[in-house]
Protein backbone atom coordinates (compact mmCIF):
# COMPACT_ATOMS: atom_id res chain seq x y z
CA UNK A 1 0.00 0.00 0.00
CA UNK A 2 2.77 2.42 0.93
CA UNK A 3 4.62 1.82 -2.33
CA UNK A 4 1.50 2.45 -4.43
CA UNK A 5 0.79 5.62 -2.46
CA UNK A 6 4.35 6.80 -2.99
CA UNK A 7 4.13 6.19 -6.73
CA UNK A 8 0.84 8.02 -6.93
CA UNK A 9 2.28 10.85 -4.86
CA UNK A 10 5.19 11.29 -7.23
CA UNK A 11 2.90 11.64 -10.22
CA UNK A 12 0.38 13.67 -8.27
CA UNK A 13 -0.56 17.05 -9.72
CA UNK A 14 -2.31 19.93 -8.06
CA UNK A 15 -6.06 19.94 -8.66
CA UNK A 16 -7.57 23.35 -8.05
CA UNK A 17 -11.12 24.24 -7.27
CA UNK A 18 -12.35 26.48 -10.14
CA UNK A 19 -14.61 28.49 -7.83
CA UNK A 20 -12.07 29.26 -5.10
CA UNK A 21 -9.15 29.59 -7.50
CA UNK A 22 -9.43 33.35 -7.99
CA UNK A 23 -8.99 34.23 -4.31
CA UNK A 24 -6.08 31.74 -3.97
CA UNK A 25 -4.33 33.14 -7.03
CA UNK A 26 -4.52 36.58 -5.44
CA UNK A 27 -2.86 35.19 -2.29
CA UNK A 28 -0.04 33.66 -4.39
CA UNK A 29 0.59 36.91 -6.20
CA UNK A 30 0.61 38.77 -2.87
CA UNK A 31 3.22 36.43 -1.34
CA UNK A 32 5.37 36.54 -4.46
CA UNK A 33 5.28 40.32 -4.69
CA UNK A 34 6.02 40.96 -1.02
CA UNK A 35 8.98 38.54 -0.84
CA UNK A 36 12.44 40.14 -0.81
CA UNK A 37 14.58 38.69 -3.66
CA UNK A 38 17.78 40.46 -2.44
CA UNK A 39 17.80 38.62 0.92
CA UNK A 40 20.55 35.97 0.91
CA UNK A 41 20.02 32.67 2.72
CA UNK A 42 23.05 30.33 2.80
CA UNK A 43 21.23 27.16 3.85
CA UNK A 44 17.89 26.46 2.19
CA UNK A 45 15.51 23.52 2.51
CA UNK A 46 15.85 22.99 -1.24
CA UNK A 47 19.49 21.95 -0.92
CA UNK A 48 18.68 19.57 1.95
CA UNK A 49 15.85 17.96 0.03
CA UNK A 50 18.00 17.55 -3.08
CA UNK A 51 20.84 15.99 -1.06
CA UNK A 52 18.51 13.58 0.71
CA UNK A 53 16.93 12.50 -2.57
CA UNK A 54 20.38 12.03 -4.11
CA UNK A 55 21.54 9.90 -1.17
CA UNK A 56 18.46 7.67 -1.28
CA UNK A 57 18.58 7.16 -5.05
CA UNK A 58 22.22 6.87 -6.17
CA UNK A 59 21.18 6.37 -9.81
CA UNK A 60 19.06 9.51 -9.77
CA UNK A 61 20.38 12.36 -11.89
CA UNK A 62 19.02 15.89 -12.15
CA UNK A 63 17.15 16.69 -15.30
CA UNK A 64 19.18 18.88 -17.61
CA UNK A 65 17.62 22.33 -17.70
CA UNK A 66 16.95 23.73 -21.18
CA UNK A 67 19.08 26.86 -20.86
CA UNK A 68 19.40 29.75 -23.24
CA UNK A 69 22.99 29.77 -24.52
CA UNK A 70 24.60 33.19 -24.33
CA UNK A 71 28.26 34.15 -24.83
CA UNK A 72 30.44 34.85 -21.83
CA UNK A 73 31.37 38.27 -23.13
CA UNK A 74 27.84 39.53 -22.55
CA UNK A 75 27.95 38.35 -18.95
CA UNK A 76 31.32 39.98 -18.47
CA UNK A 77 29.99 43.25 -19.82
CA UNK A 78 27.12 43.27 -17.28
CA UNK A 79 27.60 45.28 -14.13
CA UNK A 80 26.27 43.61 -10.97
CA UNK A 81 25.32 46.18 -8.34
CA UNK A 82 26.27 44.93 -4.86
CA UNK A 83 24.79 46.81 -1.90
CA UNK A 84 27.30 48.03 0.67
CA UNK A 85 27.34 45.96 3.85
CA UNK A 86 29.24 45.89 7.12
CA UNK A 87 32.82 44.68 7.07
CA UNK A 88 31.98 41.68 9.25
CA UNK A 89 29.22 40.52 6.93
CA UNK A 90 31.44 41.02 3.88
CA UNK A 91 34.11 38.82 5.42
CA UNK A 92 31.59 36.11 6.24
CA UNK A 93 30.09 36.25 2.73
CA UNK A 94 33.50 36.09 1.06
CA UNK A 95 34.43 33.14 3.22
CA UNK A 96 31.20 31.28 2.46
CA UNK A 97 31.32 31.80 -1.37
CA UNK A 98 34.20 30.13 -3.23
CA UNK A 99 35.54 32.12 -6.15
CA UNK A 100 36.38 30.08 -9.25
CA UNK A 101 37.99 32.92 -11.18
CA UNK A 102 41.07 33.11 -8.91
CA UNK A 103 40.46 36.72 -7.81
CA UNK A 104 40.84 36.41 -4.04
CA UNK A 105 41.71 39.99 -3.20
CA UNK A 106 39.09 42.19 -1.53
CA UNK A 107 39.04 44.63 -4.43
CA UNK A 108 38.51 41.85 -6.97
CA UNK A 109 36.03 39.98 -4.76
CA UNK A 110 33.53 42.81 -5.11
CA UNK A 111 33.76 42.71 -8.91
CA UNK A 112 33.82 38.92 -9.25
CA UNK A 113 31.11 37.42 -11.46
CA UNK A 114 31.02 34.12 -9.53
CA UNK A 115 30.06 35.84 -6.28
CA UNK A 116 27.37 37.90 -8.02
CA UNK A 117 25.97 34.75 -9.63
CA UNK A 118 25.87 32.90 -6.29
CA UNK A 119 24.06 35.79 -4.55
CA UNK A 120 21.51 35.97 -7.35
CA UNK A 121 20.98 32.20 -7.20
CA UNK A 122 20.43 32.35 -3.41
CA UNK A 123 17.87 35.15 -3.71
CA UNK A 124 16.11 33.23 -6.49
CA UNK A 125 15.94 30.11 -4.34
CA UNK A 126 14.36 32.05 -1.51
CA UNK A 127 11.85 33.60 -3.92
CA UNK A 128 10.69 30.19 -5.13
CA UNK A 129 10.69 28.79 -1.59
CA UNK A 130 8.15 31.44 -0.60
CA UNK A 131 6.12 30.67 -3.70
CA UNK A 132 6.18 26.94 -2.99
CA UNK A 133 4.97 27.55 0.58
CA UNK A 134 2.07 29.61 -0.77
CA UNK A 135 1.26 26.82 -3.28
CA UNK A 136 1.26 24.25 -0.47
CA UNK A 137 -1.09 26.48 1.54
CA UNK A 138 -3.39 26.66 -1.49
CA UNK A 139 -3.33 22.86 -1.82
CA UNK A 140 -4.23 22.41 1.85
CA UNK A 141 -7.05 24.95 1.60
CA UNK A 142 -8.38 23.20 -1.54
CA UNK A 143 -8.30 19.87 0.32
CA UNK A 144 -10.19 21.43 3.21
CA UNK A 145 -12.72 22.80 0.76
CA UNK A 146 -13.11 19.37 -0.86
CA UNK A 147 -13.61 17.74 2.56
CA UNK A 148 -16.23 20.37 3.38
CA UNK A 149 -17.97 19.72 0.06
CA UNK A 150 -17.97 15.97 0.78
CA UNK A 151 -19.56 16.57 4.17
CA UNK A 152 -22.18 18.74 2.52
CA UNK A 153 -22.87 16.05 -0.12
CA UNK A 154 -23.02 13.02 2.19
CA UNK A 155 -24.84 14.68 5.08
CA UNK A 156 -28.43 15.81 5.08
CA UNK A 157 -27.41 19.41 4.43
CA UNK A 158 -29.41 20.68 1.47
CA UNK A 159 -30.05 23.91 3.35
CA UNK A 160 -26.33 24.63 3.74
CA UNK A 161 -25.75 23.95 0.03
CA UNK A 162 -28.54 26.36 -0.89
CA UNK A 163 -27.15 29.00 1.50
CA UNK A 164 -23.69 28.68 -0.11
CA UNK A 165 -25.20 29.13 -3.57
CA UNK A 166 -27.18 32.13 -2.37
CA UNK A 167 -24.05 33.76 -0.92
CA UNK A 168 -22.16 33.27 -4.15
CA UNK A 169 -25.01 34.71 -6.17
CA UNK A 170 -25.27 37.70 -3.80
CA UNK A 171 -21.56 38.38 -4.28
CA UNK A 172 -21.97 38.25 -8.07
CA UNK A 173 -24.99 40.56 -7.85
CA UNK A 174 -23.05 43.07 -5.71
CA UNK A 175 -20.17 43.03 -8.19
CA UNK A 176 -22.63 43.59 -11.06
CA UNK A 177 -24.32 46.48 -9.22
CA UNK A 178 -21.01 48.15 -8.46
CA UNK A 179 -19.83 47.83 -12.07
CA UNK A 180 -22.97 49.12 -13.87
CA UNK A 181 -21.84 51.39 -16.73
CA UNK A 182 -23.61 54.51 -17.91
CA UNK A 183 -24.23 53.08 -21.38
CA UNK A 184 -25.26 49.54 -22.34
CA UNK A 185 -27.14 48.71 -19.13
CA UNK A 186 -29.28 46.02 -20.80
CA UNK A 187 -26.21 44.15 -22.07
CA UNK A 188 -24.62 44.41 -18.62
CA UNK A 189 -27.74 42.94 -16.97
CA UNK A 190 -27.78 40.07 -19.49
CA UNK A 191 -24.15 39.24 -18.73
CA UNK A 192 -24.81 39.38 -14.98
CA UNK A 193 -27.73 36.99 -15.39
CA UNK A 194 -25.53 34.63 -17.41
CA UNK A 195 -23.01 34.68 -14.56
CA UNK A 196 -25.76 33.75 -12.12
CA UNK A 197 -26.86 30.85 -14.30
CA UNK A 198 -23.26 29.59 -14.46
CA UNK A 199 -23.42 28.24 -10.86
CA UNK A 200 -24.14 24.47 -10.62
CA UNK A 201 -27.74 23.92 -9.60
CA UNK A 202 -28.15 20.28 -10.68
CA UNK A 203 -25.86 17.26 -10.46
CA UNK A 204 -26.54 16.15 -14.06
CA UNK A 205 -23.78 17.15 -16.50
CA UNK A 206 -22.39 15.69 -19.69
CA UNK A 207 -19.61 13.08 -19.73
CA UNK A 208 -17.25 15.41 -21.55
CA UNK A 209 -17.47 18.00 -18.76
CA UNK A 210 -16.80 15.30 -16.14
CA UNK A 211 -13.72 14.17 -18.06
CA UNK A 212 -12.47 17.75 -18.31
CA UNK A 213 -12.97 18.26 -14.56
CA UNK A 214 -11.31 14.96 -13.63
CA UNK A 215 -8.25 15.79 -15.73
CA UNK A 216 -5.59 17.26 -13.38
CA UNK A 217 -4.38 20.78 -14.11
CA UNK A 218 -0.94 20.74 -15.73
CA UNK A 219 1.13 22.99 -13.46
CA UNK A 220 4.19 24.40 -15.13
CA UNK A 221 7.22 23.46 -13.03
CA UNK A 222 10.17 25.91 -12.97
CA UNK A 223 12.95 24.95 -15.35
CA UNK A 224 10.89 22.27 -17.13
CA UNK A 225 9.95 22.46 -20.79
CA UNK A 226 6.31 23.26 -21.46
CA UNK A 227 4.35 20.26 -22.82
CA UNK A 228 2.50 20.73 -26.09
CA UNK A 229 -1.23 21.18 -25.49
CA UNK A 230 -4.18 21.54 -27.78
CA UNK A 231 -5.87 24.87 -28.41
CA UNK A 232 -8.82 24.05 -26.15
CA UNK A 233 -6.51 23.16 -23.26
CA UNK A 234 -4.47 26.29 -23.74
CA UNK A 235 -7.65 28.37 -23.68
CA UNK A 236 -8.80 26.73 -20.47
CA UNK A 237 -5.51 26.83 -18.59
CA UNK A 238 -3.74 29.95 -19.84
CA UNK A 239 -3.73 31.30 -16.29
CA UNK A 240 -1.42 28.52 -15.06
CA UNK A 241 1.58 29.89 -16.95
CA UNK A 242 1.33 33.26 -15.23
CA UNK A 243 2.67 31.83 -11.95
CA UNK A 244 6.12 30.92 -13.27
CA UNK A 245 8.46 32.78 -15.63
CA UNK A 246 9.37 31.58 -19.09
CA UNK A 247 12.51 29.54 -19.75
CA UNK A 248 14.22 32.58 -21.22
CA UNK A 249 14.15 34.40 -17.88
CA UNK A 250 15.78 31.54 -15.86
CA UNK A 251 19.11 32.54 -14.30
CA UNK A 252 21.52 29.58 -14.32
CA UNK A 253 25.28 29.08 -14.55
CA UNK A 254 25.04 28.15 -18.23
CA UNK A 255 22.93 31.28 -18.97
CA UNK A 256 25.51 33.47 -17.27
CA UNK A 257 28.35 31.78 -19.20
CA UNK A 258 30.17 30.45 -16.14
CA UNK A 259 29.81 26.71 -16.90
CA UNK A 260 29.01 24.42 -19.80
CA UNK A 261 25.36 23.45 -20.41
CA UNK A 262 26.01 19.80 -19.39
CA UNK A 263 28.02 20.60 -16.24
CA UNK A 264 27.59 18.73 -12.98
CA UNK A 265 26.63 21.82 -10.93
CA UNK A 266 22.87 21.74 -10.24
CA UNK A 267 20.95 25.00 -10.37
CA UNK A 268 18.24 26.28 -8.08
CA UNK A 269 15.59 25.04 -10.50
CA UNK A 270 16.71 21.40 -10.07
CA UNK A 271 16.55 21.77 -6.32
CA UNK A 272 13.10 23.29 -6.53
CA UNK A 273 11.88 20.44 -8.76
CA UNK A 274 13.25 17.75 -6.45
CA UNK A 275 11.85 19.46 -3.36
CA UNK A 276 8.45 19.79 -5.01
CA UNK A 277 8.46 16.09 -5.88
CA UNK A 278 9.54 15.09 -2.37
CA UNK A 279 6.99 17.37 -0.73
CA UNK A 280 4.30 16.09 -3.05
CA UNK A 281 5.19 12.50 -2.12
CA UNK A 282 4.98 13.24 1.59
CA UNK A 283 1.70 15.05 1.22
CA UNK A 284 0.21 12.26 -0.90
CA UNK A 285 1.37 9.67 1.66
CA UNK A 286 -0.15 11.65 4.51
CA UNK A 287 -3.42 12.18 2.65
CA UNK A 288 -3.65 8.48 1.73
CA UNK A 289 -3.17 7.42 5.37
CA UNK A 290 -5.73 9.91 6.64
CA UNK A 291 -8.27 8.93 4.01
CA UNK A 292 -7.83 5.20 4.65
CA UNK A 293 -8.11 5.66 8.42
CA UNK A 294 -10.86 8.27 8.87
CA UNK A 295 -12.89 8.57 5.71
CA UNK A 296 -12.95 4.96 4.52
CA UNK A 297 -15.02 4.41 1.45
CA UNK A 298 -16.11 8.03 1.31
CA UNK A 299 -13.11 8.96 -0.86
CA UNK A 300 -14.21 6.48 -3.52
CA UNK A 301 -17.69 8.01 -3.75
CA UNK A 302 -16.33 11.57 -3.79
CA UNK A 303 -17.77 13.83 -6.47
CA UNK A 304 -16.10 16.97 -7.63
CA UNK A 305 -18.01 20.17 -8.25
CA UNK A 306 -19.34 20.05 -11.79
CA UNK A 307 -19.10 23.07 -14.00
CA UNK A 308 -22.42 23.93 -15.59
CA UNK A 309 -22.53 23.90 -19.35
CA UNK A 310 -23.03 27.38 -20.72
CA UNK A 311 -26.09 27.79 -22.90
CA UNK A 312 -27.01 30.80 -25.02
CA UNK A 313 -29.18 33.38 -23.33
CA UNK A 314 -32.50 33.74 -25.19
CA UNK A 315 -35.10 36.49 -24.81
CA UNK A 316 -38.48 36.80 -26.47
CA UNK A 317 -37.82 40.47 -27.08
CA UNK A 318 -34.75 39.56 -29.13
CA UNK A 319 -36.75 37.03 -31.19
CA UNK A 320 -39.47 39.61 -31.81
CA UNK A 321 -36.84 42.16 -32.75
CA UNK A 322 -35.29 39.76 -35.25
CA UNK A 323 -38.68 39.01 -36.82
CA UNK A 324 -39.46 42.72 -37.13
CA UNK A 325 -36.04 43.44 -38.59
CA UNK A 326 -36.54 40.69 -41.20
CA UNK A 327 -40.00 42.02 -42.10
CA UNK A 328 -38.66 45.56 -42.35
CA UNK A 329 -35.78 44.39 -44.56
CA UNK A 330 -38.25 42.54 -46.84
CA UNK A 331 -40.44 45.64 -47.13
CA UNK A 332 -37.44 47.81 -47.98
CA UNK A 333 -36.32 45.28 -50.61
CA UNK A 334 -39.80 45.20 -52.18
CA UNK A 335 -40.01 49.00 -52.18
CA UNK A 336 -36.65 49.28 -53.90
CA UNK A 337 -37.72 46.73 -56.54
CA UNK A 338 -40.97 48.62 -57.19
CA UNK A 339 -39.12 51.93 -57.52
CA UNK A 340 -36.68 50.34 -59.95
CA UNK A 341 -39.56 48.98 -62.07
CA UNK A 342 -41.30 52.36 -62.08
CA UNK A 343 -38.14 54.05 -63.31
CA UNK A 344 -38.13 51.86 -66.47
CA UNK A 345 -40.37 53.59 -69.12
CA UNK A 346 -42.99 51.33 -70.74
CA UNK A 347 -43.47 51.99 -74.49
CA UNK A 348 -47.06 52.39 -75.76
CA UNK A 349 -47.88 49.57 -78.18
CA UNK A 350 -49.14 50.24 -81.72
CA UNK A 351 -52.86 49.59 -82.50
CA UNK A 352 -53.76 46.16 -83.83
CA UNK A 353 -54.61 46.55 -87.55
CA UNK A 354 -57.37 44.37 -89.09
CA UNK A 355 -58.81 43.99 -92.60
CA UNK A 356 -62.40 44.26 -91.43
CA UNK A 357 -63.51 47.35 -89.53
CA UNK A 358 -64.57 46.91 -85.96
CA UNK A 359 -68.22 47.57 -85.12
CA UNK A 360 -68.14 48.87 -81.64
CA UNK A 361 -71.29 48.40 -79.57
CA UNK A 362 -73.02 51.71 -78.95
CA UNK A 363 -73.77 52.51 -75.36
CA UNK A 364 -77.43 52.58 -74.18
CA UNK A 365 -79.03 56.00 -74.64
CA UNK A 366 -81.02 57.32 -71.68
CA UNK A 367 -84.60 58.60 -72.08
CA UNK A 368 -85.47 62.28 -71.74
CA UNK A 369 -86.20 63.23 -68.15
CA UNK A 370 -89.73 64.60 -67.49
CA UNK A 371 -89.77 67.44 -64.92
CA UNK A 372 -92.08 66.97 -61.91
CA UNK A 373 -93.60 69.84 -59.89
CA UNK A 374 -92.17 70.36 -56.50
CA UNK A 375 -94.41 69.81 -53.51
CA UNK A 376 -92.96 71.57 -50.54
CA UNK A 377 -94.10 70.68 -47.09
CA UNK A 378 -93.87 74.32 -46.07
CA UNK A 379 -96.61 75.26 -48.61
CA UNK A 380 -98.96 72.61 -47.19
CA UNK A 381 -98.34 73.89 -43.69
CA UNK A 382 -98.93 77.49 -44.82
CA UNK A 383 -102.49 76.59 -45.97
CA UNK A 384 -103.19 74.96 -42.64
CA UNK A 385 -101.83 77.95 -40.66
CA UNK A 386 -103.58 80.67 -42.70
CA UNK A 387 -106.25 81.33 -40.02
CA UNK A 388 -103.67 81.54 -37.28
CA UNK A 389 -101.60 83.98 -39.30
CA UNK A 390 -104.72 86.17 -39.91
CA UNK A 391 -105.48 86.35 -36.18
CA UNK A 392 -101.88 87.26 -35.43
CA UNK A 393 -101.97 90.11 -37.97
CA UNK A 394 -105.23 91.48 -36.47
CA UNK A 395 -103.72 91.52 -32.97
CA UNK A 396 -100.64 93.29 -34.23
CA UNK A 397 -102.83 95.97 -35.88
CA UNK A 398 -104.84 96.52 -32.68
CA UNK A 399 -101.67 96.94 -30.65
CA UNK A 400 -100.36 99.49 -33.09
CA UNK A 401 -103.65 101.47 -32.98
CA UNK A 402 -103.60 101.46 -29.18
CA UNK A 403 -100.04 102.77 -29.16
CA UNK A 404 -100.84 105.60 -31.56
CA UNK A 405 -103.94 106.61 -29.55
CA UNK A 406 -102.00 106.65 -26.32
CA UNK A 407 -99.26 108.79 -27.80
CA UNK A 408 -101.86 111.30 -29.08
CA UNK A 409 -103.55 111.62 -25.68
CA UNK A 410 -100.20 112.06 -23.97
CA UNK A 411 -99.36 114.91 -26.31
CA UNK A 412 -102.69 116.68 -25.59
CA UNK A 413 -102.16 116.40 -21.81
CA UNK A 414 -98.69 117.86 -22.09
CA UNK A 415 -99.99 120.81 -24.09
CA UNK A 416 -102.71 121.58 -21.52
CA UNK A 417 -100.17 121.43 -18.69
CA UNK A 418 -97.94 123.86 -20.49
CA UNK A 419 -100.84 126.29 -20.92
CA UNK A 420 -101.76 126.15 -17.19
CA UNK A 421 -98.19 126.75 -16.12
CA UNK A 422 -97.95 129.72 -18.41
CA UNK A 423 -101.02 131.25 -16.82
CA UNK A 424 -99.72 130.71 -13.27
CA UNK A 425 -96.33 132.11 -13.99
CA UNK A 426 -97.78 135.56 -14.77
CA UNK A 427 -96.58 137.97 -11.90
CA UNK A 428 -99.29 139.69 -9.72
CA UNK A 429 -98.97 142.55 -7.17
CA UNK A 430 -99.31 141.67 -3.41
CA UNK A 431 -101.63 143.84 -1.24
CA UNK A 432 -100.02 146.19 1.26
CA UNK A 433 -100.22 145.18 4.97
CA UNK A 434 -102.17 147.19 7.56
CA UNK A 435 -99.83 148.63 10.22
CA UNK A 436 -102.53 150.23 12.43
CA UNK A 437 -103.74 146.84 13.60
CA UNK A 438 -100.69 144.78 14.52
CA UNK A 439 -101.07 141.04 14.93
CA UNK A 440 -100.87 139.83 18.55
CA UNK A 441 -100.92 136.03 18.98
CA UNK A 442 -103.26 134.60 21.67
CA UNK A 443 -102.36 132.09 24.30
CA UNK A 444 -103.71 128.63 23.57
CA UNK A 445 -106.08 126.91 25.94
CA UNK A 446 -104.49 123.52 25.55
CA UNK A 447 -102.28 122.04 28.28
CA UNK A 448 -98.65 121.56 27.48
CA UNK A 449 -97.64 118.06 26.52
CA UNK A 450 -96.28 115.88 29.35
CA UNK A 451 -93.31 113.75 28.18
CA UNK A 452 -93.34 110.05 29.05
CA UNK A 453 -90.55 107.44 29.05
CA UNK A 454 -90.72 104.85 26.31
CA UNK A 455 -91.74 101.34 27.33
CA UNK A 456 -88.78 99.06 26.57
CA UNK A 457 -88.69 95.26 27.15
CA UNK A 458 -87.05 95.00 30.59
CA UNK A 459 -85.79 91.55 31.74
CA UNK A 460 -86.89 90.03 35.06
CA UNK A 461 -83.58 90.40 36.95
CA UNK A 462 -83.53 94.18 36.21
CA UNK A 463 -87.13 94.94 37.04
CA UNK A 464 -86.51 95.78 40.74
CA UNK A 465 -83.85 98.37 40.01
CA UNK A 466 -85.90 99.85 37.17
CA UNK A 467 -89.04 100.06 39.29
CA UNK A 468 -87.25 102.01 41.99
CA UNK A 469 -85.96 104.52 39.47
CA UNK A 470 -89.32 104.75 37.66
CA UNK A 471 -91.15 105.59 40.91
CA UNK A 472 -88.84 108.49 41.51
CA UNK A 473 -89.30 109.67 37.94
CA UNK A 474 -93.11 109.52 38.22
CA UNK A 475 -93.09 111.57 41.37
CA UNK A 476 -90.76 114.07 39.74
CA UNK A 477 -93.02 114.43 36.70
CA UNK A 478 -96.10 114.83 38.89
CA UNK A 479 -94.45 117.59 40.91
CA UNK A 480 -93.38 119.36 37.77
CA UNK A 481 -96.98 119.33 36.50
CA UNK A 482 -98.26 120.82 39.75
CA UNK A 483 -95.69 123.60 39.70
CA UNK A 484 -96.55 124.42 36.11
CA UNK A 485 -100.27 124.70 36.90
CA UNK A 486 -99.57 127.00 39.81
CA UNK A 487 -97.60 129.30 37.57
CA UNK A 488 -100.51 129.57 35.21
Swiss-Prot record:
Keywords: Cytoplasm, Cytoskeleton, Developmental protein, Microtubule. GO terms for cellular component: cytoplasm; microtubule; spindle. InterPro entries: TPX2_C, TPX2_fam. The keyword Cytoplasm applies. GO terms for molecular function: microtubule binding. Residues 264-280 have a biased composition (Low complexity). It is found in: Cytoplasm, Cytoskeleton. Induction: Induced by ethylene (ACC) via PIF3 binding to its promoter and subsequent transcription regulation. Accumulates upon submergence through ethylene signaling. Repressed by aminoethoxyvinyl-Gly (AVG), an inhibitor of ethylene biosynthesis. Higher levels in light-grown hypocotyls. Disruption phenotype: Reduced hypocotyls length in light conditions and in response to ethylene due to reduced cell elongation and associated with the disruption of cortical microtubules. Suppressed effects of submergence on hypocotyl elongation and cortical microtubule reorganization. Residues 25-56 have a biased composition (Polar residues). GO terms for biological process: cortical microtubule organization; microtubule depolymerization; regulation of mitotic spindle organization; regulation of plant organ morphogenesis; response to ethylene; response to light stimulus; response to water-immersion restraint stress; unidimensional cell growth. Residues 25-71, 262-304, 436-457 are annotated as: Disordered. The keyword Cytoplasm applies. It comes from the Eukaryota. Belongs to the TPX2 family. Binds directly to microtubules. Microtubule-destabilizing protein involved in the PIF3-dependent positive regulation of hypocotyl cell elongation via the modulation of cortical microtubules dynamic in response to light and ethylene signaling. Promotes submergence-induced and ethylene-dependent underwater hypocotyl elongation. PANTHER family: MICROTUBULE-DESTABILIZING PROTEIN 60, TARGETING PROTEIN FOR XKLP2. This is Microtubule-destabilizing protein 60.
